[in-house]
Amino acid sequence: MKIIHKGLVEYLPTFEAMKTFNAGRNADTEDELWVVEHPPVFTQGLAGKPEHLLIRDDIPVVQIDRGGQITYHGPGQLVVYTMIDFKRRKTSVRNIVSALENSIIATLAEYGIEAAADPKRPGVYVGERKIASLGLRIKNGSVYHGLALNVNMDLSPFTHINPCGYAGMEMTQIADFVQPCPTPDEVAAKLTAHLETQFTPKADNNE
């Protein structure tokens, strides 16, 4: 699995690059993790409803092809796009989602933060507050899009939406629990290590 650090990049070109990568895959294409941050942007998934955008401001809204509803990306949030051929790995989308959740939970545990997935709601939570979001697109036996983990960011734009369609959803981030807060790059080193562990053949075959 190849890990590519892209830094702070605009959302729309990254979205187009994901689609291009997935469309051009073949049986020998190596899976990749893209580690990025984005300038402020709202992304509206396939299930998104306009009424979940509560306040219209100068933050752009991009309609995209992942599952789920509306979320926010901004600087200080660690985003990892998972370009994974799940058929070749003989695994399932559910197992991939679990691997993403488990990797986030293990990463947060390294910082002394107790987090958990919620079977009734997508994402990872600290208590009732959401600290990470997940969203995937399944196409041609592969997945793309991925996860977003709040590290040290301005959370106020989340109040302009119903995050992932949930009214009143409270958000949190690593900076609320750890000071000095690690940088997104420091968190990325731990998170990608856990992702690599989760996506070893042993993990893939543990269905």
Curated annotation (Swiss-Prot):
Catalysed transformations (reactions): octanoyl-[ACP] + L-lysyl-[protein] = N(6)-octanoyl-L-lysyl-[protein] + holo-[ACP] + H(+)
UniProt-listed Enzyme Commission number(s): 2.3.1.181
Site (Lowers pKa of active site Cys): K130
GO MF terms held by the record: lipoyl(octanoyl) transferase activity
A GO CC annotation given for this chain: cytoplasm
Residue ranges annotated for the BPL/LPL catalytic domain, each copy included: 27-203
Top-level EC class as recorded in UniProt: transferase
Alphabetical UniProt keywords: Acyltransferase, Cytoplasm, Transferase
Residues where substrate binds: R66, G67, G68, Q69, I70, T71, Y72, H73, S133, L134, G135, G146, L147, A148
Localisation: Cytoplasm
Known pathway: Protein modification; protein lipoylation via endogenous pathway; protein N(6)-(lipoyl)lysine from octanoyl-[acyl-carrier-protein]: step 1/2
GO biological process: protein modification process
Superkingdom of origin: Bacteria
Other remarks in the entry: In the reaction, the free carboxyl group of octanoic acid is attached via an amide linkage to the epsilon-amino group of a specific lysine residue of lipoyl domains of lipoate-dependent enzymes.
Role description: Catalyzes the transfer of endogenously produced octanoic acid from octanoyl-acyl-carrier-protein onto the lipoyl domains of lipoate-dependent enzymes. Lipoyl-ACP can also act as a substrate although octanoyl-ACP is likely to be the physiological substrate.
Family: Belongs to the LipB family.
Protein name according to UniProt: Octanoyltransferase
Organism: Neisseria meningitidis serogroup B (strain ATCC BAA-335 / MC58)
The encoding gene: lipB
